[in-house]
């Protein structure tokens, strides 16, 4: 599941069933029981040992920022409203500083425990289309609130509160207080998942 307020454009779940409903009809059957904002788009038969969480090789999250002096009501709880102009080139440089294999303790919520805080970020980039900025980050796994803290740190770079060149030192310190804030959940989307079964990557 995702945290409260976070969105999914692509989400995969698995379950075992003895239902006689044909697999291609399952989405229609399930959608009669789901809330309006949850839709099952496809069902597939997979190997018995498949696990939607453990079998996932990497994920992509997208954080959306609506960068305009005037709010857009259609983006309420769908993008983070930021009225001051943001330099996407500075933000992209800051985002790229997170790429690679690092200890990401400095950008996770304090008080959360995991076996390891080392993750590999395959890409972390910022782009703009009109008033909408997107930070896309793909990794082999994420710590709690990691993407939202990365986004807050990238925003700090745009605000001049730190430089993109400061980020490697912040990561090395493991000190959460040196990184940027955890931005609100409404702008965060899970947008891609990768599995060995290629059918699930389409």
Give the role of each language-model region:
Residues 1-202:
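Structured-RNA-binding interfaces characteristic of tRNA pseudouridine synthases
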